[in-house]
């Protein structure tokens, strides 16, 4: 076992909005250390979101944050082996993991989408998540449904 808990790395806020959550999202979006490319994809997606939802009184960043909140799961199931049987035990998710899961799901399902550029796909997924639909929102609903179905095993603790 390690002697001490490793220190959390400080994440700097992004240059345009000054928001740490944006930088975390871009870090998940980034491939091969190409952060500038990831930033341009993200900002391009927000511009597309702004044009798509121009009648909305919120800014593109607020729409993105609302979309993330809509696809953030509250509970997940973990496998726990007891007496030769494996049970799916519903557990609460800690806040950092909730944020991370929602960001990863948004990016994953944006990548799976059909579309021209990644910015287009990401913008479409953000708009869908904002409107409580799309693949990332469906994933959250599935996670909650699994937890609800296995509520009988909630007394097994980790």
Curated annotation (Swiss-Prot):
The keyword tRNA-binding belongs to this UniProt entry's keyword annotation: yes
Pfam families xrefs: Ribosomal_S7 (PF00177)
Sorted UniProt keywords: Ribonucleoprotein, Ribosomal protein, RNA-binding, rRNA-binding, tRNA-binding
Gene3D superfamilies: Ribosomal protein S7 domain
GO cellular component: small ribosomal subunit
GO biological processes: translation
Keyword check for Phosphoprotein: no
InterPro entries: Ribosomal_uS7, Ribosomal_uS7_bac/org-type, Ribosomal_uS7_dom, Ribosomal_uS7_dom_sf
Molecular function terms from GO: rRNA binding; structural constituent of ribosome; tRNA binding
Family stated for the protein in its record: Belongs to the universal ribosomal protein uS7 family.
Subunit structure: Part of the 30S ribosomal subunit. Contacts proteins S9 and S11.
PANTHER family (alphabetical): RIBOSOMAL PROTEIN S7
Function: One of the primary rRNA binding proteins, it binds directly to 16S rRNA where it nucleates assembly of the head domain of the 30S subunit. Is located at the subunit interface close to the decoding center, probably blocks exit of the E-site tRNA.
Protein name (Swiss-Prot/TrEMBL): Small ribosomal subunit protein uS7
Source species taxonomy: Bacteria, Pseudomonadati, Bacteroidota, Bacteroidia, Bacteroidales
Gene: rpsG
